[in-house]
Amino acid sequence: VLASNMIPVYYDETNDVWKKADVSNLDKNNPWYSYNSSGEYKGMWANAVTVTSTNRTTYLNASPGTVIPMDDINTMWVWIPRFNAVTPSNYNGGTKEAPGAIDVTFVKQNETAIDAFTFGNKELSGFWYAKFETSHTTLTATAGTTDNNLGCTTTTCSNANGIIIKPNVQSLSRNNISNFFYASRSMEQSGNSFGFVSSEVDTHMSKNNEWGAVAYLTQSIYGRCISSTTCSEVYINNSLRYYTGRSGDIPSALSTSTGIYEYNQNKVESTIVEGTGTTVTPTITNDTTYPWTNNSGVYSSGNSAQYETTSTLTYTFTLIDKGVVSFDYSVSSEERYDRLKYRISKDSTIVVDTTGISGTSRGMTESLLEYENKVHVLEKGTYTLVFLYSKDDGGDGGLDKGYVKNVKVLNGAQTIDKVLPGGQNASTTGTIYGIYDMAGGLDEYVMGVYNKTISYSGFSSLPDTKYYNNYTESSYTGHALTETKNWYSDGAVFVNSSNPWFYRGGMFNNSMAAGVFKIYNSSGIYADMSSRFVITN
């Protein structure tokens, strides 16, 4: 399974580092993987990395448990074992919003499997799927100035040596499909930066059916499902700056600059221990144009029906020691478009950002509104807590207001903290061992084409048929296409003669339309799209 110069790894949560795993998977102190459907190690899909040449020999010869710093890693991969699946239909017993699990069975190399595990005339035991969207050490993406800057037209493209697949870097875009394809194929060229040996591996751009296989496994008891009827949606990467591995605070979160959580960042829910801490009285600054109304301590925003406006309510306070700020907030508004959010800044630096809440699910009358409590533990310093109710350019819903009450600031308060997944919610397993950026981030080109139509992909002729899936109809059952259309409300538009190339996953700002089951079409031209790479061996 491991090719030459690939290193098995696991994540040490205590120290927030990746370490070399025991390749035999017998050492429980340095475990590598588990594809069990339950138990302590559920969701621990096998991860492996390549490293730069500087310390490659050291890490290859190192003992299990050796730290492998992210600075030395240039690519990260996740193993997708060979499996067969019952083709899903009718939301698999669930609903559009909550489809059921896909029935997946792991099989041996000589047993029947879905077609993603057939590569040319070879039956695969599995394949390595890139853990994150494709990035680059030096190339950036700026529309109009860096289009097709990979410059890859053959399998010996020098720019491919700068490919990186890791978290917290900006995805590479603005390249057409052929550029991404030849960059992926060039990762195994002689003298490559990753240590790949071309006689052992085939590096290529993800085909549509390979994406589909990952989507199937995600929507199974080995991925995001805890039973045949209970599954959770992969959270969106909502970073509008295209940072890899980021996550929103809900599956369909609206975009923020860098996302809410990094890939390994936990969410901490705190509860104040009653009777601890001393009260700090914050200074309240109301909006001068659309002031909030104070009704017995309940503040409501003042820009109802005022389109393209924002009404703010600001609390300023100073903590002389570690402390907390807590509050209750709610909203009754047009779903997705009119939202209440909050932001906490320390000395003008944002330390807590949110995507906001919207809709009418919390209530349609003020007396019956359901509120959500938030508690944030803060270090010593001066802070501003700003609530913002923002209106889009048209349409109202519910009461068309945001609500805030019970704002409390305490110096020296004690809290009971509960650690929950944060960034991990954006992976295919809900753990750090899954695959990221498959919902949001950037749309991703895959090698799936309608009727072998080259269009604006950049190919002079298509590569060997083992590198792409060809479709000749307006629908297809399999590959997570027609059979999973609109699951979780993910967008779905099939390829055609005008836009013959598939892309998957969705953008940072697609909200509910983004997801592992999203499909859409394009001419294959350079655009704000990235790609995903695969290793078979």
Q: Each PLM stretch: what is its role?
A:
Residues 318-328, 381-384:
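Extended extracellular/luminal ectodomain segments enriched in beta-structured repeat modules
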Residues 67-75, 105-264, 412-438, 537:
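Short aromatic-cysteine micro-motif
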